[in-house]
Design a protein with these regions (language model features):
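Secretory/exported precursors with cleavable N-terminal leaders
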Residues: 1-327
Length: 327
């Protein structure tokens, strides 16, 4: 059984096989966990089940645990926001403040949504929406920001322009950074090769893991197969092997230097994964308001990453719009 993260990535990949994907499943998990506090009945059941939890308490505890774990080194910064035009149920506000450390403010227009996102991503994501329907009563927001240097930095003089094979087997010239004969944690099996790159963080709690299919012949097939087969067991197996002392190997590593952004509307993917009730007109959002008929209008995520010789800068912003059923 795959966790939410891997189920989500696989589903996303089936729809976008030709694209460079950049997503933060954790950002979605946190925003849905926060949102589930505003729901009841089937709406809540589907949301919690999608996240692989059994109860609302378990959902909140885990979201809280994830945030604390990621933020402990001050390398990752996580922010949650509730922008609202209505006065939400007291219990929902309390949960938002206590478990999610949410910033609560008035929802004025789309500019104040974009400003929140821009502030929390250090200006890297300047806007997440172009407009906001007047029927949107509340916007939930999550932002994750990460910046760290490599423990072993790449020498800028060893960055070369080289041919790189795209997924459709076409070639293009890209900047490839190079580490020659460095001792790195390296693992391979019949299907894949994986290498772990450490950031300059005291307890080594955050690393980058690059995974490549072994076969270079049928690149598109190999990459899609690799994603298709990726689940908790395989991933933990890779990580476990990379963490062994015995995995330290002298490696010549070429790593593309790249800057990438990616945005996606998550409505369809989440429906396909079993969370459909929240998007329907008869969704149960009594946890936010017992008087108003509310449902989710859309869930968006926008991501940015910059990988260079010095390190990595990455951020993610997720936006969830709760709308009033208008007759």
């Amino acid at each position: 059984e795959s966790s939410f993260e891997f189920k989500f990535i696989k589903q996303l990949n089936t729809k976008n096989k030709e694209k460079n994907l950049l997503v933060s499943p954790i950002g979605i998990e946190i925003i849905l966990s926060l949102c589930s506090n505003g729901t009841e009945g089937l709406t809540q059941k589907e949301m919690i089940k999608l996240l692989k939890y059994n109860t609302l308490d378990e959902t909140n505890d885990n979201a809280n645990k994830i945030m604390n774990e990621l933020e402990k080194n001050n390398i990752v910064k996580i922010a949650n926001g509730i922008l609202t035009k209505i006065r939400p149920n007291e219990k929902f506000v309390r949960k938002g403040l206590n478990d999610y450390k949410s910033h609560i403010d008035e929802l004025k227009n789309y500019n104040n949504v974009n400003k929140w996102v821009m502030d929390k991503t250090n200006g890297k994501i300047k806007k997440i929406i172009d407009k906001l329907s007047p029927d949107v009563m509340m916007v939930l927001l999550n932002a994750i920001y990460f910046e760290a240097f490599w423990k072993k930095q790449f020498d800028i003089n060893h960055t070369y322009i080289k041919e790189f094979y795209n997924i459709d087997n076409s070639k293009e010239n890209v900047e490839l950074m190079f580490l020659r004969g460095e001792k790195l944690n390296y693992y391979e099996n019949d299907d894949l090769k994986a290498v772990k790159l450490d950031y300059n963080i005291q307890d080594n709690s955050i690393n980058a893991i690059a995974i490549l299919p072994k076969s270079e012949q049928y690149l598109e097939q190999s990459i899609n197969d690799l994603i298709e087969n990726l689940d908790d067991n395989l991933f933990y197996n890779i990580v476990e092997n990379l963490n062994k002392e015995s995995s330290i190997t002298k490696v010549n590593l070429y790593l593309p230097k790249y800057e990438l952004d990616f945005e996606i509307n998550l409505n369809e993917i989440l429906k396909e994964l079993g969370m459909s009730k929240a998007f329907e007109r008869d969704a149960e959002f009594q946890g936010i308001s017992s008087k108003l008929k509310l449902f989710i209008n859309k869930i968006l995520q926008k991501n940015y990453i910059n990988v260079n010789e010095k390190g990595t800068q990455a951020c993610s912003a997720s936006e969830l719009e709760i709308m009033l059923e208008s007759y």
